[in-house]
Amino acid sequence: MIPEKRIIRRIQSGGCAIHCQDCSISQLCIPFTLNEHELDQLDNIIERKKPIQKGQTLFKAGDELKSLYAIRSGTIKSYTITEQGDEQITGFHLAGDLVGFDAIGTGHHPSFAQALETSMVCEIPFETLDDLSGKMPNLRQQMMRLMSGEIKGDQDMILLLSKKNAEERLAAFIYNLSRRFAQRGFSPREFRLTMTRGDIGNYLGLTVETISRLLGRFQKSGMLAVKGKYITIENSDLLAQLAGQARNVA
């Protein structure tokens, strides 16, 4: 029997809410390591919004930090605007990722977050989450793990841009996407790129022409099969080697 409070929350959120206990990506998100009682407490503070359409923003640079956002489905890109007025993409966030950590230090978002496709998110009021984490050691530890993962990702990106050539950058990007899809229960070998080649080039510091040329080269070498936005990894060993990784992706 479903508890009365949970029934009320389902009705208030449109009758179709997926709760933390039932979410297929909870192992990548805040609920991981929490017991049933802690999950219920976390679930009570989460707001589940209607789908975010492609092009819509979760927040803009300069906005006050009010909530963190856990992505349930879809893809969100984060970006800043340079002094010259150009967009600089700083990350692509998939289901299970949390967006907004970089605003905790100052209390204001330093970047924009925009949907690359129709996406679903869970909005988590930060002040309430912060208060709850002070009472729940497991929650606090998981928050620290997630923040640590963000820092590690930033370090990897710095290394990628400073040490690798164009071919290695793109291979590492595809390898990383493959690994992230695998973590979410999707095929690590066949997937669709939700970002444009221009977005990929912007993120990697390469031109659109270079991205297209390299994808063609990867296809000719038998490493990938490319059809529009769809990627099939044909030779995972070669991709891992070019990406500077020792382990296979598929």
Curated annotation (Swiss-Prot):
Give binding positions for [4Fe-4S] cluster: 20, 23, 29, 122
Region Activating region 2C: list its residue ranges: 127-128
- Return the PROSITE patterns for the record: CNMP_BINDING_3 (PS50042), HTH_CRP_1 (PS00042), HTH_CRP_2 (PS51063)
Record's CDD domains?
Answer: CAP_ED (cd00038), HTH_CRP (cd00092)
Matching Pfam families: cNMP_binding, HTH_Crp_2
Q: Where is this region: Activating region 1B?
A: 116-121
Q: Per the database record, which ranges form the HTH crp-type domain?
A: 164-237
Key words, A-Z: 4Fe-4S, Activator, Cytoplasm, DNA-binding, Iron, Iron-sulfur, Metal-binding, Repressor, Transcription, Transcription regulation
- Residue ranges, annotated region (Activating region 3A): 60-61
Q: Annotated DNA-binding ranges?
A: 197-216
Segment Activating region 2A: which positions?
Answer: 47-50
Identify the cofactor(s). [4Fe-4S] cluster
Region (Activating region 1C) location: 181-191
Where's it found, cell-wise? Cytoplasm
Q: Enumerate the Gene3D superfamilies for this protein.
A: Jelly Rolls, Winged helix-like DNA-binding domain superfamily/Winged helix DNA-binding domain
Q: Where is this region: Activating region 2B?
A: 123-124
Q: How does it assemble?
A: Homodimer.
Report the function annotation for this chain: Global transcription factor that controls the expression of over 100 target genes in response to anoxia. It facilitates the adaptation to anaerobic growth conditions by regulating the expression of gene products that are involved in anaerobic energy metabolism. When the terminal electron acceptor, O(2), is no longer available, it represses the synthesis of enzymes involved in aerobic respiration and increases the synthesis of enzymes required for anaerobic respiration.
Name of the featured protein: Fumarate nitrate reduction regulatory protein
Give the species this sequence originates from. Klebsiella oxytoca
Q: What taxonomic classification does the UniProt entry list for its organism?
A: Bacteria, Pseudomonadati, Pseudomonadota, Gammaproteobacteria, Enterobacterales
Q: Which gene encodes it?
A: fnr
